[in-house]
Structures are given as structure tokens and as C-alpha cells.
């Protein structure tokens, strides 16, 4: 007996508004962007996934004091995003 084939209707995603503000970056993303080239230089020929793994290990190894500058950047970026989003929503609604 053959299994009944079910067909799902695909829902189309909304197109992303190019004028929408970019999302706020996390503290880890600031750290990763700053250290990605260093990790690649220390490990030539490393794959994309391995770079992420090494960065994650380095992030976990940092103390709270060492993470503080990245946390501060993330907080400032979050405020930037919220203010840009507020302005964007106000102009979009008008």
C-alpha cells in the first residue's frame, strides 16, 4: 500500500523593506566581526564553520570584564536600532 502524498501550500514571505533599519547586533557579533580576520590568519585554510566554532570558544573563554566593551557596543547599537525603528514606523504610518 502506497503512502498518501500530502501537498503543502507554500506561503510566500513578505518582501523585506530595504528602507527598514538594520537589526541591532549582539555583543558576540561585535566580538566576532573584530576577531574573525585574526582567527583566519592564525588558522590558514580553516573552513567557515570552523571559524565560527573557534570564535564561539574564544567568546565563552572571555571573562565578564573582557566582554564589557562588546556589551557596551551592543547596548548602544540596540538604542540606535530602537530610535531608527521608531522613526521608520512613524514615517511608514504617516
From Swiss-Prot:
Compositionally biased region (Basic residues): 7-16
Location (main, coarse): nucleus
GO cellular component: chromosome; nucleus
SUPFAM superfamilies, alphabetized: HMG-box
Portion annotated as DNA-binding: 21-89
Function: DNA-binding protein that induces severe bending of DNA. Required for DNA-binding by the FACT complex, a general chromatin factor that acts to reorganize nucleosomes. The FACT complex is involved in multiple processes that require DNA as a template such as mRNA elongation, DNA replication and DNA repair. Also augments the fidelity of transcription by RNA polymerase III independently of any role in the FACT complex.
Family affiliation: Belongs to the NHP6 family.
Protein name, entry field: Non-histone chromosomal protein 6
Amino acid at each position: 500500500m502506497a503512502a498518501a502524498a500530502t501537498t503543502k501550500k507554500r506561503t510566500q514571505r513578505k518582501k523585506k523593506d530595504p528602507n527598514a533599519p538594520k537589526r541591532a547586533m549582539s555583543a558576540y557579533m561585535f566580538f566576532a566581526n573584530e576577531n574573525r580576520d585574526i582567527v583566519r590568519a592564525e588558522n590558514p585554510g580553516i573552513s567557515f564553520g570552523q571559524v565560527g566554532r573557534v570564535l564561539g570558544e574564544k567568546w565563552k573563554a572571555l571573562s565578564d570584564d573582557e566582554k564589557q566593551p562588546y556589551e557596551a557596543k551592543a547596548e548602544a547599537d540596540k538604542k540606535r536600532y530602537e530610535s531608527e525603528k521608531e522613526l521608520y514606523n512613524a514615517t511608514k504610518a504617516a
